[in-house]
Structure formats: structure tokens, C-alpha cells
Amino acid sequence: MQVLPLYVMSTFKMGPMGIGLCFIPLFTPSFFSTLIGSAVDQYGSRKITLLAFLIDVPYFLLLQLVTENTTHDKILLYILLFFAGLAAALKTVALMVEVNHVVEEKEKECPGIFGEQGGTAQAYGLYNVAWSGGQVLGPLVAGWLVEWKGWATMVSVFGIVSGGMAIVLAVTSKDVVRLGMQG
């Protein structure tokens, strides 16, 4: 959503305060991270991550409909930004848990592989590097897409990529692989 401030400014003729208010629905879901954590504990990190990418697809595609300086489009934008924030919060919590699970699994397979202190800090460091790379690459790609073909193309591409990630998560899930072997 790195191009969001510029899009909101040009579409809705908003100033800094109006643009800042757009971030309220985007970040509100992060206050429910403890509930999301409970859901991850109950259903598993991969299922919650899959759900997050599935939520990404419609909200990205529906952002194409936000095109005019009308109350309807502003309300639609705020609703879609809430779902964008929800998907982001789901992914953040679930992926952090997944990092921990991978480290624990590797340490069980090969005790001491990460040294005396374990590999959790190193794994979170790598997670942070990957996340930061996305935070750099995402705005560059989004900006390029908006300049090249416009807002609708940018949100469509991000929706398609999210759909692709959902497919990858679904087909690589242990539950799906087991069903394929049984069938």
C-alpha cells in the first residue's frame, strides 16, 4: 500500500490529515493480534497464512473500483483497507509462528545444528531480512506498475500474486499432499 497516499491524494483531493486517516482501518486489525495468535495455535500457521492470501485476492481486485471522489468510493476504500490490514496481521502472526516451528523441527532432526543457543534469533533475523526486502521491492514494483499502466493494473497484479501464493500454500500443505496420496 506504499502508493496509497499518492493515489488517495490525487483521487480524493485529500491533504495529509485525510491521507493519515486512511491508515486507521489499515492498521486497526493489528490490535487483534492476540486473537489471531489464538487462531494460529488452534488451526495452524499454514491455514491462517492461506486464509490471509485468500483475503488478499478480492480486496486487491476490488480496489480497482475505487476511482472517483465520492462518499461511496471513500467508504469502499476504508472497508477494503480494513481487510488489507486483516490479511497483513494474519500473515505477520502466522509467519512468525511458522519460523519458530521450522527452527524447532530442524533442531529435533539435528540436535545442536544451530549451536548451543539454538537458531531462533538467526531465523527471525532471516525472516526480517526477507520482510525488509519485500518492503523495499514492493513499493518499487507498485510504483512502476502505477506509472506504467495505472492503479487498476497494480492492484490486479498484487491480487494475482496473492492468489498464486494461496495456491502454492494449498498444494504444498501436508493435508493436501496426504489427500493426494490417498486418492
Where are the predicted features?
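Helix-to-loop junctions at the C-terminal end of transmembrane segments
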Residues: F32-S45, V146
